[in-house]
Amino acid sequence: MARTRAEPAGRARSRRRARRLAVPFLISGILHAVPWWRLVLTPSWPAEATVAAGAVAAVLAVGLPVLLVSGRRRGTGVLAAAGPVWLGVVWQLFVWTLAGELLRLVLAVTGVPDPLRARATALAVLGWTAALLAWGAYRALGPVPVRERAVHVEGLGPALDGLRVVQVTDTHLGPFLSRRWTTRIVEQLDGLRADVLVHTGDLVDGRLADRRHQVEPFGAATARDARLFITGNHEYYSGAAEWTGYMESLGWTVLRNRHVVVRRGTDELVVAGIDDRTAATSGVPGHGADLDAALAGAPEGAPVVLLAHQPRQVFGAVDRVDLQLSGHTHGGQLWPFGYLVRLDQPTLAGLSRHGPRTQLYTSRGTGFWGPPFRIFAPPEIAVLTLRRARPGA
């Protein structure tokens, strides 16, 4: 009897596992089939080219999920890079193939016949996608722009007026961004004359043994008052306890549900930090966002800057802090993913207000995750100059 009950349960688990395995291959199949259909088959290119392109698309459709999984397990090397690169390429091909239907419609209305219409559309889509990917790769891997912004803070003391908070976030040091890239970022940071330098999470994608040499240059970054680090969700995929310990060994203060106080004479500013919202379910003992603990013992009446990786953490901080600094969204990174991000987060990038007291600054991030492209979502290093609130503002 027990065996009879166990067999259906075992079959149910097998079916669930099969479905989980099938979904990535189904998605990959759609991403490859649509461009092949509209860019190769519909334009009636020579039969040999159509068949060859179809065979390549089929191999890539099956290979992409395998590359992504094997590359993630390996962590370094060609396999770790190949999957994300091709994912970015085929995603943009898929998106702009769909968008190309508008051009196809315009050409049809203006009387352009097929197969000329289909071929013109295919060439336009391929050319536009190639140019966009080249620009997106430069945006992701090239120089990181500095974005400066003044933020008016209620109750900021006159001695703290003009305090410079420099934010770097979502560096995602992995198979693409080398130690040289980190060194270049640190050189930029040192030129920005930070009073408070913060990293708001998602430092790396990988274990300490594989990535420490890429992170090490952050130990040379300088700031007048403090260098502060908080966890993002990716720390909990990569060994949060190891990475927080390593950042402390580099001289950074890790704010895990606690705060520091920046003083100029008798004027004070509280800078608090909390764990990422995923920390409590990560399985890492003692980790979990706790704003009450972060603010415990803070000087009464002093303005508060909160470091919280995800913008949506502002919902628990409204009217308890004056300014929250977050990352996580990457500004969408690959258009049109930004629209999906907005379903989960209150904002994509920039400064926003939440309640009468609280402002939120969301950085687009300094690095990138996955595909080494940034399409309509440039990276940034944010320089926020804190100013006393204007009368009546």
Language model segments and positions:
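Juxtamembrane/interfacial segments around transmembrane helices
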Residues: L102-G111, A137-E148, T171-E187, P217
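Canonical alpha-helical transmembrane segment with a positive-inside/aromatic-interface signature
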Residues: L116-D161, V165-Q167, L173-S178
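Soluble catalytic domains of enzymes that build or remodel membrane lipids, polysaccharides, and related
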Residues: H152-A393
